[in-house]
Amino acid sequence: MANVTQWALRAAATVAIASASNVYASCGVESGKVSILSNDFPALHAVANMAETCASDKVTVTKNQTKDHRNLQVAALKANPAKYSSAIVSTSSIVPLLNEGLVRPLDDLVAKYGASLQPSQLIRVDGKVMAVAFMANSQHLFYREDILKLAGVEPPTTYDELIAAAKVIRDKGIMSNPIALNTKTGWNLGEEFINMYCATGGDFFKGNSAQPNINNPMGVKALNTLKALTELSNPDYLTFDSNVTQSLWEDGKVAFAVMWGSRGSAILDDEGSEPDIVASTRLVSTPSLEKGGLPATTLWWDGWTVSKNLSDADAEATFKVMVKATSTEMMKANSEKAVWLIEGYQPNDAAKGVIDSVQNKARPYPMLPYMGSLHSALGSELSDFLQGKESAEQALKDAEAAYTASAKEQGFL
């Protein structure tokens, strides 16, 4: 699967995609029930809105777009029939569904109705198509060019440079808390550590085992860098998720932010912010920990699945609707909202940070069945260190212990 993902991301980054040749003129669905569970941001709004165009007196299409989608998906898809016929997933959120056997192989449906899909979109697990990817994503750096010029500092390419620049901005009284990251306790905080650790080049696990491998000098460096950034952030940084960070940016309260590329179009549009802020916003690759090093981020894909606990008729209807929802027609109408992995996509300014990170060889998020357990442990165990209550080594030891308990419970260790 990693090879498919990297190929797709590379294709988006190099724009090696031809014009569309096979677009559904209509959804081709005569009857059925389609219900979509997804995260809540503009690119996914576009997908769901296109899906809703397939609704008729015999076809129902409903959606639940919420930031709590991860917490809902397993229980919702365990129901029989499943509460949602399609969960829109990412590199990590598909793993619990695969572990529980809650999504169906799509090979037969791809053969019958997937002529418009590119091979690079087909996410395979053990040789079977289990999801259809439609966009690439990563977290990367947003900076305010006007604030940097006012402070007399250059755009940073490493985190040491970013921290030094932020200190100048603070010391000159330009901004008191010039940095924002998605450091909310839980999934977001865990992801920030994973991003930093990826930049060290270290492996999260020992060899081919599920034994954790983060309590080491690379883990300490990642944590210390994260702490230095939070010391230049607002004191309530442990509440910052994507919505909060975007709001801080649009309100002109920060000079640097690490946000998801999928937020780029909303940041650069003419809504929710002032024209001077938008005009001076720059999207670039995530900084590295050292000159010429790997970007401190992970590469992701977003895609759709079809639930296992459905009638074959509703599964077929869902597949056809989701093909329409992620068609070239949808992409062309919303090209600025994501780095689409859809035929015919041409990148724009909002895609620059993701593409730069890909070209700088950012690592894919590890698609391992036990990575979610480590991610959760990191999200719950690192805040004490950031608040000065324990050492980096102790925080990493606690995270490894929490992960080990979870991994043993699930049979990974």
Predicted regions and their residues:
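Conserved N-terminal structural module of periplasmic/extracytoplasmic solute-binding proteins
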Residues: 6-13, 23-95, 155, 238, ...
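Conserved C-terminal helix/tail region of periplasmic/extracytoplasmic solute-binding proteins
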Residues: 28-33, 58, 149, 332, ...
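A structural signal for short loop-to-beta-strand junctions that line the ligand-binding cleft
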Residues: 75, 83-85, 113-148, 177, ...
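Hinge/lid segment of periplasmic solute-binding proteins
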Residues: 91-138, 154, 163, 192, ...
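Short, solvent-exposed loop/beta-turn-alpha elements that line the ligand-binding surface or hinge
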Residues: 104-120, 179-184, 200-221, 270-281, ...
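Extracytoplasmic/periplasmic substrate-recognition and gating elements
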Residues: 129, 150-151, 220, 224, ...
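Extracytoplasmic/periplasmic solute-binding protein
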Residues: 130, 139, 163-211
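Glycine-centered hinge/linker elements that transmit conformational signals in sensory
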Residues: 166, 209-238
